[in-house]
Amino acid sequence: MRELAARHTVVATDLRGYGESDRPPSGEDHAGYSFRAMAADQAGVMAELGFERFAVVGHDRGARVTHRLALDHAERVERLALLDILPTRYVYAHVDRALAQAYYHWFFFIQPADLPERLIAGDPIYYLHRLLGSWGSGLAAHDAESLAAYEKAFADPEARHAMLEDYRAGAGIDLEHDAEGARLRAPTLVLWGEKGVVGRNPEPPTHVWRPLAADPALVTGQAIPDAGHFLVEENLPATLSALTAFLGP
């Protein structure tokens, strides 16, 4: 962020339920942690700060919120960058053995409360380390300060429940919202780790995303070499180069 902040005004937020953000009730349909609700949060933050139009960069769950933000608030999103994700509905529609093993947590996290909550509570930090360690370069990709921030958040049972509600929404109400058929209308950069799960997808990620845009030409992208899921941590120079070229001066 420091490098981007040298050229741009950077607003970095924790999604609702994550980090130090509030953890509001979810509701029976998990709508409180839907990407639509989270996108509305981000739009509200930017309005409060006085930014009517803006570019958005998101990674992982943040990228899914970025996608929904660009759909629900298309008039405000000038351009967006999606880091290391495939569309949620695409993932669920293309599950095979390899994907199920790599993304096992998607199917564990969506189980009804409080089964995942209780199981993770047995040793949350161990589970966090195993989860982070299974992606890309493993725990070595994260410096001590970043890992401590993950651990602090994950030690909070309410934060873990909020995270699980996010995934439960992803398997339910978020898919209903996707079925509404809105399409991306802003220039979209798709970046993925060459060595990660997204990078190993049989269909190139840009080919997956282009049908979800009003004009397929809006979607461009590239693999980040020598990187898995955590692009910034594993290859900052290449990720930053792609982002700065896309975002402009």
Walk through the language-model features, giving the residues of each.
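Flexible "cap/lid" subdomain of the alpha/beta-hydrolase fold that forms the substrate-access gate
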Residues: 11, 18-57, 61-223, 232, ...
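Conserved short acidic donor-positioning loop in nucleotide-sugar-dependent glycosyltransferases
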Residues: 227
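Short amphipathic alpha-helix adjacent to the substrate-entry channel of hydrolases
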Residues: 1-9
